[in-house]
Amino acid sequence: GDAAKGANVAKSCGTCHSFEQGGAKKQGPNLFGITTRGPGKAEGFNYSPSYKAAAAKGFAWDAATLQDYITDPTAFLSNKTGDAAARDKMTFKLAKPDERADVIAYLATLK
């Protein structure tokens, strides 16, 4: 993916997420450092019970995992938890594969 293009695509995510170090939590957690911290570790953010259950089972925010999550957060959590009723606060899906790859490349620069 192209991080510069991803930064542009990620602007649409800015309604719910901040991207700068120390940025405020919004409807969603701050995404700065997402690829270097564990899931559910954004300070001060109250994750959904399903997200917490998935995080407790263990996974890392690598490119493949981010790809699965931003494709369909609900399906991702259902698969991780084994609970078909699992739900997340994030309902937005990034439909275009090239945009997902670009956003993931951008997120990887936020360290």
Curated annotation (Swiss-Prot):
Residues holding heme c: C13, C16, H17, M90
Endpoints of the signal sequence: none
Gene3D superfamilies according to UniProt: Cytochrome c-like domain
One Pfam family this sequence matches: Cytochrom_C
Modified how: Binds 1 heme c group covalently per subunit.
Entry GO MF terms: electron transfer activity; heme binding; metal ion binding
Keyword terms of this UniProt record: Electron transport, Heme, Iron, Metal-binding, Transport
PANTHER family: CYTOCHROME C
Protein's name in the database: Cytochrome c-550
Organism: Novispirillum itersonii
